[in-house]
Each structure stands twice: as C-alpha cells, then as structure tokens.
Amino acid sequence: MAIRVRIPTPLRKLTGDKGEIEAKGANISDLMENINKTYPGIKERIYDETGEIRRFINIYVNEEDIRFIDGNKTAVRDGDEVSIIPAI
C-alpha cells in the first residue's frame, strides 16, 4: 500500500493528466522528493528557491493542514491521503 496524493488541475500536465498518484515517503519532504523523481518538475512548482512550500500552496494530510502539524517533516504512512491545493 502507498500514500495517495491528489494532484490539482494546474499540475496534472506534469503527471500525465493524473488527478491522483501513489507515492512513498516517511514525511512530506521525502514524499515530494519521490514524486519529483517520477514526475520531474513538480517539486519546483510546489517549493520556492529556498526549499519552502510556496505561500500559495497548501498541503493536507488526511484533511489536516501540515502548517499546523510539522510542515515538511509531517509524517505520512501507507494509506494516508495527501492533497496539494493551490490557493485561489
């Protein structure tokens, strides 16, 4: 089993039009690194040049905003659902 990651419409061109993908990782940072290996270019759309999540991107683990947990160090495990949501 893996972690389900919901991809917003603006980033789907990088995932071959997939709205949901599966990936692995111990935390959000690991997860994003692994996603970027499979779908190059996605990380630079989510993170700024300092390595921080862009201000207009929100990431949720099981509907909990990672900004209020541990940010990039927020733990994830098999069966979790991660949503990447750009602010409107």
Predicted segments, located by residue:
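Ubiquitin-like/PB1-type beta-grasp interaction modules and other compact soluble beta-rich domains
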Residues: 1-88
